[in-house]
Every structure is written in C-alpha cells, then in structure tokens.
C-alpha cells in the first residue's frame, strides 16, 4: 500500500490490488488511499477482515513489526491489461495463497507489455527462514526489470554473499536495474553498464517506517516521468547514462529523507519536493 500511496501523492495514476475488510482498519485504509489519489480494484474492500502490522520503534527510530495476516487475492480480481508497469513486494509476494496470484498477474501483465518491479522487503517473522522463500524470491527477481532491496534484506537472504555478488547475480537473471538501499549511508544502483553510489539526503530522523517504500515510489515516479517504464523498459533502463541514473536515485533518496523526518509512513506530496 505504501508504494501506491507514495505514487499517488506524486500525482501518478496508480491502482492498488489489495484485500481488506469492512471494519475500522479497512475503512481507514480506504480513506487513506483515496485521500492520496490511489484507485482500488473492484472487490478490494470485501475481505472477511483486515490484516494488520504493529510497528514497535527502537530508540534510533528503526522499527520491528508484528503481523496478523490473511492474504487471499485472486488473479481474476486484477483487471487484465491497461497497466504499463506493475510493482509488488514483501509479504504479499511470498505469503500464500495470495502470492501465487501475484506471480500469475506479473507474468500475465509482463506478457502484455508491462514492465515489472520488485522489492523483497523481507519480514522474517512471517517469511520464516531464507530457505523457505528463496525459490519464490528468485522467481520474482527473474520476472523483474527493476529490483530494489535494502542491505539488510540482502544480508538476511544471502548471508554468505556480498552486496556486489548479489547485485551481479540479479543482473545475470535478467534484471535491468538493481538498487540497494543502505539506510543512512544512501544507496547504490547498477545496470549492465553503469554504477552509481549516492549518500543519503540530509534529514532529521523521526522514524524509519515507510522509508524504503517512499524510495521505491520516488524512483518509479521519476522513471515513469522519463518514459523508462513499459514495453521497452529493459532496453531503456539498460541504456541510461550515469548522470540519468544518478538523478533518478537522488530523487528517490529525497523522497525517503522527507518520509523519515515524519512520524509513521507519511510519504511526500509532489509540492513537498519543490
């Protein structure tokens, strides 16, 4: 949801494929997404109950999560075609039975010309051990034009491999753009021909909830603005110059910096970015 909200606030036309109930949490989700300019698929608001995540903050603003989840999205609920890009990530892409529908939608829409992005955004408390989800994650990486992960995601999934080794492996699986975020240390991005490393944007940290999602929405928004998503995304992303890639990542880092300066997952609106 956070990526969709971030895109909506950046004035992108975005539809969220989700499921939640007619309860106080579900009604809050519906109001929040609508206020941020996000459309919902038909049937999104008719689940038996709304899943939830409780965030507990540490002294440094980092968060740990406790989840109460039901995920039963059906592929037939997601409209066929009409999207130039599809994004997925985290629990929704690995928790069954909904995860199989997510993968089916990605394969269907990619065959129809959409580009695909993926953020593993691991949640060990739900996903279990790395070995429980690696096959699914590798399949989703192989489907994707863009993969964004945090350094913490990578170290959990591949504890014996370096960031460079994992980045190189994902590129070898057909990904055109791999981005690794590193919290206060910024982010690194790599295509088949360019590598960019940028520091985090200066900010005061209130908490880190939603930072990665805000980075993702900022990156997708600026890639869309540059016509680098859609049918020819693989070629277009691979052809980016170092300066173009640097500008894309810098914008995403600015979005994340604004989000961590606020309490909760509160991504910026376009006007906040000047």
Where do the model's predicted regions map?
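Conserved N-terminal subdomain of the carbohydrate kinase-like
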Residues: 12-92, 111-114
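Conserved beta-alpha-beta core of the PfkB/ribokinase-like small-molecule kinase fold
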Residues: 85-168, 185-187
């Amino acid at each position: 949801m956070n990526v969709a909200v971030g895109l909506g606030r950046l004035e992108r036309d975005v539809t969220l494929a989700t499921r939640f109930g007619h309860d106080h949490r579900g009604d809050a989700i519906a109001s929040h997404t609508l206020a941020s300019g996000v459309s919902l698929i038909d049937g999104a608001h008719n689940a038996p109950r709304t899943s939830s995540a409780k965030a507990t903050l540490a002294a440094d603003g980092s968060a740990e999560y406790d989840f109460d989840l039901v995920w039963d999205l059906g592929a037939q609920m997601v409209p066929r075609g009409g999207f130039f890009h599809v994004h997925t990530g985290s629990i929704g892409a690995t928790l069954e039975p909904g995860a199989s529908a997510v993968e089916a939608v990605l394969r269907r829409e990619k065959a129809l010309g959409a580009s695909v992005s993926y953020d593993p955004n691991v949640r060990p408390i739900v996903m279990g051990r790395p070995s429980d989800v690696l096959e699914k994650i590798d399949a989703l990486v192989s489907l994707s034009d863009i993969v964004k992960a945090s350094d913490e995601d990578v170290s959990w999934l591949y504890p014996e491999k370096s960031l460079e080794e994992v980045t190189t492996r994902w590129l070898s699986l057909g990904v055109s753009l791999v981005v690794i975020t590193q919290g206060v240390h910024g982010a690194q991005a790599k295509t088949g021909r360019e590598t960019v490393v940028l520091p985090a944007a200066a900010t005061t940290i209130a908490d880190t909830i939603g930072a990665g999602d805000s980075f993702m929405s900022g990156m997708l928004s600026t890639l869309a603005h540059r016509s680098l998503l859609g049918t020819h995304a693989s070629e277009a992303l691979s052809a980016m110059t170092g300066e173009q890639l640097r500008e894309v990542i810098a914008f995403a880092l600015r979005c994340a910096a604004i989000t961590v300066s606020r309490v909760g997952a509160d991504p910026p609106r376009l006007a906040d970015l000047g």
